[in-house]
Amino acid sequence: DEWFPYWRNFCMDWIVKLGGNPENLRFRDHEKEELSFYSKGTTDIEYKFPWGWGEVWGIADRTDYDLTQHQNTSGKDMSYLDPITNEKYIPYVVEPAVGVERLFFMFFTDAYDEETLENGETRVVMRFNPVLAPVKAAILPLRKKYAEKAEEIRHELSYDFAVTYDEAGSIGKRYRRQDEVGTPFCITIDEQTMEDGTVTIRYRDSMEQERMTVEEVRNKICKEIRF
């Protein structure tokens, strides 16, 4: 009985750690009349979609039904001998069944944000957990004359995570483009980069910036995208 609640909690924690909003999530235990004939208990993790609550993950306690049926059909003994208690039994199966498309839609829905800035402008941001962001960092040369150095840094960082390069338009417009697609980090190459090798890293969610070496940037981003 302990493994069914374990997997219920494991699946919920997994969603939340990857950016699912706990306020939009809930457990729903199936009523007795809803249960499949093989199930001792089934719980759905439901998400509050724009149109209402819907299942994103189902966890079912299938008891020993699956292995018993396999044993009866194949003639192969599916029992397990506990080396400590010397007890022999057919193991129970807990089945967490999830649809990838629903999960993606859930994460997209939770990540989307329209933020009103101090100047009255609206900033569209996809606040993906860095682990899920398709592109982890954007390399942005402040001027085109820094393009060669920027490309060198892009190439260096691309060994560790997905990096994009953008030199079109003002730096502000480039920040906004990266915010809209959910890139968590922007790395700006400027005159000081040419002098001492440091770059500016800008954080998508807070828009705050820090100055550091490329190696420090690499270590910081690698830490943020580790799961």
Model-assigned labels for residue ranges:
Residues D1-F227:
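NTP/phosphate- and nucleic-acid-binding module
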